[in-house]
Amino acid sequence: MGMRFFGCLCLLVLTASVSAFELDTRVYPADCKTTLRIKAVSAWAQEWLKVATEMKNAGKDKFQKGKEWPLVGYYREDRRYSDSEKYITQIYPEPLDFKLEGNEIVVDVKLTGVNVHSIVFAKLPAARRRFRNFRFIKLLTVDKETFKYRPFKGNVHQHSNVSDGKLDPADHVAFARIGGMDFIGVSDHYAYKQNKSVIDFAAECKSGLTVYPAEEMHTPGAVLHSLSIGATRGHSVHRRTPKFTEAVKPEWDKLIKQFPDCDKDELLSWAETMVLARRAKADGALVVYCHPAWRRRYYINNSFAMIDFVIRSREFHAVEIINGSISRRDNQEAWAVFHEICVETGTKIPVIGSSDSHNVASGAYRRTYTLMFAPDCTFASFKDAVISGRTVASYDLDETAKRPQPMHLGASKYVRYANFLDEAGYWVRHDRITGKQGELIKKYRSGDKTVLPEIDKLAEELKQLRENFFYRSGK
């Protein structure tokens, strides 16, 4: 019991001390042999270097494995059991040979399997059990197919003053960068014209932000909405013409027979949305069922019977399973229905997360987003990532935290990947760069053209972060 407690306590202390050492590259392909050059950055790490140098000079650069902790060790997260025990127990890190070059520790390792790996540093023997004398740095290995992709953060559901939002469409470019977004869509109600100004202004700024044409599609007064992303034109209907009514009627008649007890207006809304979704898909758009469980004061807009039917229909490429502008309760209830359908049918339905922000005061524009794992940020890559299940719906529960702690929903391997990126501080570094860009873009929007070179310089800095954080053969 005491041994297991020691293992848990040590893990907690290690987790709290993650910033003593730095390593630029943190994500690797599985079964990768590499040389790590780890920098000592904190006072503790500098003291560690002093101790390590003294021990090297004295020829005592390792402790005895199994009795004392090594000066530098390796620990793999999936090592839950000892060789002889069938319960969680203390596993000592494997000693590693290392070299000291200036303030860097140079270590050769083989990172086996798909796993989280820890390089552990110790100053004193474990027999003394002084937990403050351990530090570590974590690495991630992913399968070779997943390693081909890079993480990008974006928000494809938000509104401008072209519909019911507060901001001018082009203003979304600055706030997207402040929020750390790599791609966005400004999806106004009944509107497509806003897209050109956003796309043009983003291209003018050259910050690296990618903008997809987007629209929130529905008919007048409809309770069921969907997102069209990447279409060449708008597909919403501003008024129900005889021709449109004729196109909808066959679908409405089917639904009335299938759901005789459902509200007829709700069924009409679904029939109309189905027609719009099919038109947008024919136009090459990615179509998403958005905010399934949203409410208007006292009632839910889509009954749970209808939510269930809509998701099962697979008329949409994906479901917006987290929406930043509706309550946590509504998001949870939508997720519960979604989860039950996936379990019951054995179907993997793609998900996204979006802010649905109408102004910047609420902070929703940066709190809820989609993480995609793709080769780049083009619309073709985004659409493929969503349909292939390489997206995660994310909601940042505590914006005030020094290190993001979002909730991620999606395929398990991408959720684990997303969690590692949070823990490793990737998005902190990423958002620090894009945040500076966003503030400069606001100045540029106000007429200060002198900031463009600095925006471009920051874009190059972001490119370097992406290149360095992920392993490249030969670097």
Describe the function of each predicted region.
Residues 292-294:
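Extracellular glycoside hydrolase catalytic/binding regions
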